[in-house]
């Protein structure tokens, strides 16, 4: 029971006091159910308002997608697990910062949240935990913060409308990603880290893009993209129409001029000619 000392010191006069809120710690309850909560001011007489308090199972977390995001925050992520439904004030805690969460069913219990800013410009992993009442939290997953990437060079910077061009993007802060993507204008394609070179990403040019310059950006989690503003030019497939001369000695050394149709070769970035399996440098004139 609880006691309060109210009024004057000697009882000669009294002052009416009104209590508007009580704080207490919920007791253990073996069954997962809703119970009525009443209060008493004298250990005997209880209210009869039948306010409801729900006992819930402890949440269990399985996956977080994406599992990385920008240090600037705003990454939308989903937490999949069990016993995530029915919270009165569901929150997700990343390190020491909490954000509101909303429950949805996506093949199972799922909580949606938005990652808060990290507050420092560094790559780091933080613990992720969930509380259905904004007080008790349980966790077990990690979320990685990365520094926003920057693209400094695109090679080659042109490609055929047929697609398939292997494009190398050079820059900085490409490490710490979970879902690598390249974006040509509004079109996304998968990307991968170039072997042991952490400042190089590789991606294939998608087919049938409009024949026009398009901004090329990268993402480390499939959501937030760089804003470097470098351009990639898509061109029509060149069709050779004539060779002059069309023959030469086996020793090589013949200067060959090729006429083409269907493409503006002046926008090219890397000019090459291939004789059977032999590739040689070429110049545009």
Where are the regions that the model predicts?
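Short, surface-exposed loop motifs enriched in S/T, G, D/E and P with embedded aromatic residues
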Residues: 50, 97-105, 139-140, 187-195, ...
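Beta-strand/beta-sandwich contexts
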Residues: 30-31, 36, 44-88, 134-178, ...
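Surface-exposed, short loops/turns at beta-strand junctions within beta-sandwich domains
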Residues: 29-33, 116-123, 207-212
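Ligand-recognition surfaces built from glycine- and aromatic
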Residues: 2-29
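Conserved Ser/Thr-centered positions that define the repeating blades of beta-propeller domains
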Residues: 38-40, 129-131, 219
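A generic structural motif
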Residues: 77, 108-116, 169-170, 198-206, ...
């Amino acid at each position: 029971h609880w006691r309060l000392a109210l009024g004057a010191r000697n009882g000669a006069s009294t002052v009416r006091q009104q209590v508007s809120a009580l704080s207490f710690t919920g007791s253990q309850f073996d069954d997962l159910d809703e119970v009525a909560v009443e209060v008493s001011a004298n250990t005997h007489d209880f209210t009869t308002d039948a306010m409801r308090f729900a006992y819930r199972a402890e949440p269990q977390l399985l996956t977080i997608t994406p599992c990385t995001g920008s240090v600037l925050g705003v990454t939308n992520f989903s937490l999949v697990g069990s016993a995530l439904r029915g919270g009165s004030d569901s929150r997700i805690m990343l390190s020491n910062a909490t954000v509101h969460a909303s429950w949805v069913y996506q093949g199972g219990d799922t909580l949606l949240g938005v990652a808060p800013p990290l507050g420092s410009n560094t790559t780091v992993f933080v613990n992720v935990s969930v509380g259905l009442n904004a007080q008790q939290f349980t966790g077990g997953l990690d979320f990685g913060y990365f520094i926003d990437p920057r693209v400094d060079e695109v090679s080659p910077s042109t490609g055929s409308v047929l697609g398939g061009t292997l494009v190398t993007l050079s820059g900085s802060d490409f490490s710490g990603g979970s879902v690598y993507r390249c974006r040509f204008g509004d079109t996304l394609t998968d990307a991968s880290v170039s072997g042991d070179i952490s400042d190089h990403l590789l991606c294939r040019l998608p087919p049938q893009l409009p024949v026009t310059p398009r901004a090329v950006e990268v993402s480390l989690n499939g959501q937030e993209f760089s804003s470097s503003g470098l351009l990639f030019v898509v061109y029509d497939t060149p069709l050779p129409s004539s060779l002059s001369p069309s023959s030469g000695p086996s020793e090589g050394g013949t200067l060959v001029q090729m006429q083409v149709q269907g493409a503006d070769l002046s926008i090219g970035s890397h000019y090459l000619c291939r004789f059977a399996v032999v590739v040689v440098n070429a110049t545009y004139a």
